């Protein structure tokens, strides 16, 4: 039986100034954070909804690049934050907009002292991509524990899932990616357990 968690959207930040104000508040109240990031159209909003057990907490869209801000979701009864970072790698938006999203992500990772893990979402259907690997390297360079997650496994055969796990395990110093589907909920409880274990370690 799945553990029940309640998620509530607490804040949305579009600028570096807004983000710093939010980080200051969380720092003062000693609120721990778990960040989620991934390429545009990786299924991040759908996964947040699956984690929450709700359909429209995070807005989903067939158009990549839906998340254009940093969104903070309070998790109850444990009282920590899931932080939804903007999707990256969406070629159809302007270069300036892509640079702004990258700046927000980098600023957050560099300045959040309460960030306890970085959940990197990776599309199971495609081979390892440079942007995903670079973001994983960036997070680990700041000593942020990495939780790699292969999404959309309901669209991949088992042999392909195993292949992707092996590829990423080789790239991430033998860290085993979780296999998750927001559609059939496979792996969602395991992801919650990994997140909870990380929070309980502090």
From Swiss-Prot:
Q: One GO cellular component term, please give it.
A: cytosol
Q: According to the UniProt entry, where is the signal peptide? A: none
**Biological process GO terms, please?**
division septum assembly
Which keywords fit this entry according to its UniProt record? Cell cycle, Cell division, GTP-binding, Magnesium, Metal-binding, Nucleotide-binding, Septation
Binding residues annotated for Mg(2+), in chain numbering: 45, 67
* Domain of life (superkingdom): Bacteria
What terms describe the molecular function in GO for this protein? GTP binding; metal ion binding
Cofactor(s) this protein requires: Mg(2+)
> Is Cell division included in the keywords of this UniProt record?
yes
Keyword presence, GTP-binding: yes
Q: Where along this sequence does the record place binding of GTP?
A: 38-45, 65-69, 84-87, 151-154, 180-182
The protein's matches in Pfam families, at most eight in alphabetical order, are given as: MMR_HSR1
**Domain EngB-type G per the UniProt entry, residue ranges:** 30-201
- PANTHER family for this protein: ENGB-TYPE G DOMAIN-CONTAINING PROTEIN (PTHR11649:SF13), MSS1/TRME-RELATED GTP-BINDING PROTEIN (PTHR11649)
Family note: Belongs to the TRAFAC class TrmE-Era-EngA-EngB-Septin-like GTPase superfamily. EngB GTPase family.
The entry's function note states: Necessary for normal cell division and for the maintenance of normal septation.
Recorded protein name is: Probable GTP-binding protein EngB
Q: What is the lineage of its organism?
A: Bacteria, Pseudomonadati, Thermodesulfobacteriota, Desulfovibrionia, Desulfovibrionales
């Amino acid at each position: 039986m799945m553990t029940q968690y309640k998620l509530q959207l607490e804040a949305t930040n579009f600028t570096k100034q807004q983000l710093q104000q939010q980080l200051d508040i969380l720092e003062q109240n000693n609120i721990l954070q778990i960040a989620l990031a991934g390429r545009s159209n990786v299924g991040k909003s759908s996964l947040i909804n699956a984690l929450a057990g709700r359909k429209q907490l995070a807005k989903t869209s067939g158009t990549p690049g839906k998340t254009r801000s940093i969104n903070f979701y309070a998790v109850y009864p444990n009282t920590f934050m899931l932080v939804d970072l903007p999707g990256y790698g969406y070629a159809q938006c302007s270069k300036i907009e892509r640079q702004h999203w990258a700046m927000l992500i980098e600023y957050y990772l560099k300045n959040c002292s309460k960030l306890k893990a970085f959940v990197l979402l990776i599309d199971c259907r495609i081979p390892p991509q440079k942007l995903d690997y670079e973001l994983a390297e960036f997070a680990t360079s700041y000593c942020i524990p990495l939780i790699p997650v292969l999404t959309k496994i309901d669209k991949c055969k088992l042999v392909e899932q195993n292949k992707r796990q092996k590829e990423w395990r080789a790239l991430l110093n033998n860290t085993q990616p979780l296999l998750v589907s927001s559609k059939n909920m496979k792996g969602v409880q395991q992801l919650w357990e990994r997140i909870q274990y990380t929070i309980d370690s502090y």
